[in-house]
Amino acid sequence: MSSEDLQDHHEIGNEVIKKKGVYTKKKCQDCFFLILFLLFWAGMIVVAAFGVKNGKPDRIVKGTDQYGNICGVNNIEQGILNETQARDTTNEPYVYFIYYPDLIGINYRVICIEECPNSTYTDLNDPNQLICDYGTVPATNQISPNGTCMGKIKSKLIFNRCIPDVTNTSVVLNSIVDEIYQFVNNQLTSDLSVEILTDLTNSWRYLIYGALIAMGLGLTWIFLLRFFAGFITWLTVFAAYACLGLLTAQVYFQWQDSKDAYENTIPSQRLVMQEKNILALKVIFIILCVVCGIFALILLALFSRIRIAIRIIKECSRAIGIMPSIFFFPIFIFLLLCGFTVYWVYIGVYLATAGSPTYDDQYRFTGYEADSKLQKIQIYHFFGYLWTFAFILALNQTTIAGAISSWYWVQDKKDTPFFPVWSSFFRVIRYHLGSIALGSLILAIVQFIRWVLRFLEKKFKGKEAYLARFIVRCLNCIFGCFERFIKFLDKNAYIMVSIYGYSFCQGAKRGFQLVLTNILRVAAVNLVSSFLMFLGRVFITAATVGISLYLLKEHENLSFYIIPVILIGFIAFAISTGFMSVYDMSIDTMLLCFCEDCERNDGSPERPYYMSKSLRKFVDGKGRSKCC
């Protein structure tokens, strides 16, 4: 920083102190990026309108007949199919397979019916035991050779489809059942992304339950940490590890149970989704075992330093105790994140089913094909999620930083501004949204590049493109490190922006200089406190996922229930991040304020320090009078 910039910076700092911790001569910064963000969201609204207009989630949820009619709706009014194919199936909500033998084996027709048959035919000469295609009347004493009429088979309802439920039947009938199971497997795996989104839609209540559980655990953790910092910190360490161990054991036993059930099923009647669930549980179990081992090593390495981190947490608790509304701010952030995620998934389901229907050579529905225009729209929608999610988290970080800094920069802490959290929030809304938009945009771009690299790595998998796969993995590793650096830079920039009203680039520059100058002094605090906050996230996430896994494993309408559980895990981690960010951001803000305090003041009566004695003693290590 040049001497002229440093002089301007000191003048701004003195203004902060005069105004009881709040710099009042702020102005809007980075306005261009705020306008860009608003224009991008105008595009998101257009994308949502396109998805709602063209998407048909019922195609997957309710199923279709071989003509493309959605079961359980009036397809004539929807006007998707031509007049000769469209049919009103309002009173026919279930998919049924009319099977019949032909020259190449077993063939089938697909229709919508009122209810699944509850018994298997015994006499094909009885018209009441036959089921026919649309417009065909069962003929007495005969069945149709082309499959328009065949005998009923007792069926059970799976994913809105009538699947034969037969035992001790003839070889021919078992062959028919095998064919239908194969058809269901093909249909359910024809577009796995659509099926996953459908499962998320069917389990929306459990997603909300999981979010509420995570929110309750987060509020409890923060409230107790305020009054019992030392006890809760140690409890968090052991509880997080215990929950992780219990979750590992639960996943192991559920993996074994699922594998046993799969092996006891007739091979021809095994669903692909069962196998995918077993594989997913096995992979998750192995990952959890590795994570448990890593956590054990980290705990051994940081055991003595955890006591030091407790002191800084207590100092943050002093600041938070003066502003109790800070406990409720994560709820506001949670509502924003939850509402936006629900909106994004909802529109995503519509976009995933907005493609053109595809059919086989007998004009039976097989899936959907997205053209290049739809693919670009889906990419736009995905990037919007990354940018907006980062924007909301940045809003939380900047608000917390502004509230804590307004407490730090007053000699008498009773002079802290009234309602510091919400005052800081309104300052952010008024002056700093452009800076937040820029910081979150940079982070979203890096995250998007990493997702593209993951896609390329998956595309090269199984092919003899070893060099390309190696390059992609290296790039993914590099951008992973770069993403962590951007998050670090963003956080420091938001702190300086909230204190002095800098633009994003100015704040990032000044924040990085402060950390670089005091790197040895603050590194240990940052490392230990960040690890403790991460343990809090693990505790909340592991407990939430464990409860959700128990609730969802018995859900009948989910074909791949691990996906909702994983999403609940992400939601719980995001919610816990919002809660932990209160202490995490408080610690980082205090450290940067401390460095600023050291640079500007020397402890003399004319230029006294603003830090508390306990904080100064902790950071200085030996309680020396010299600050830096």
UniProtKB/Swiss-Prot annotation:
Cite a single Pfam family from the UniProt record: Choline_transpo
Q: Which reaction does it catalyse?
A: choline(out) + n H(+)(in) = choline(in) + n H(+)(out); ethanolamine(out) + n H(+)(in) = ethanolamine(in) + n H(+)(out)
The membrane topology noted for this protein in its Swiss-Prot or TrEMBL record is: Multi-pass membrane protein
Entry keyword set: Antiport, Cell membrane, Glycoprotein, Membrane, Mitochondrion, Mitochondrion outer membrane, Phosphoprotein, Transmembrane, Transmembrane helix, Transport
Q: Which GO terms describe its biological process?
A: choline transport; ethanolamine transport; transmembrane transport
Q: Which GO terms describe its molecular function?
A: antiporter activity; choline transmembrane transporter activity; ethanolamine transmembrane transporter activity; transmembrane transporter activity
Sugar-bearing residue positions: 82, 118, 146, 168
Q: List the disulfide bonds.
A: none
Keyword Plastid listed: no
One GO CC annotation: plasma membrane
Extracellular topological domain: 53-204, 248-282, 341-381, 454-530, 581-628
Report the InterPro entries cross-referenced here: Choline_transptr-like (IPR007603)
Chain ranges on the Cytoplasmic side, renumbered to this chain: 1-31, 226, 304-319, 403-432, 552-559
Transmembrane domains' residue ranges = 32-52, 205-225, 227-247, 283-303, 320-340, 382-402, 433-453, 531-551, 560-580
Give a yes or no for keyword Ribosomal protein in this entry.
no
Compartmental location = Cell membrane; Mitochondrion outer membrane
Per the record, the similarity remark reads: Belongs to the CTL (choline transporter-like) family.
Question: Matching PANTHER family, A to Z?
Answer: CHOLINE TRANSPORTER-LIKE (SLC FAMILY 44), CHOLINE TRANSPORTER-LIKE PROTEIN 2
Q: Which purpose does this protein serve, as stated in its record?
A: Choline/H+ antiporter, mainly in mitochodria. Also acts as a low-affinity ethanolamine/H+ antiporter, regulating the supply of extracellular ethanolamine (Etn) for the CDP-Etn pathway, redistribute intracellular Etn and balance the CDP-Cho and CDP-Etn arms of the Kennedy pathway.
For this entry, the protein name equals Choline transporter-like protein 2
Its source organism is Dictyostelium discoideum (Social amoeba)
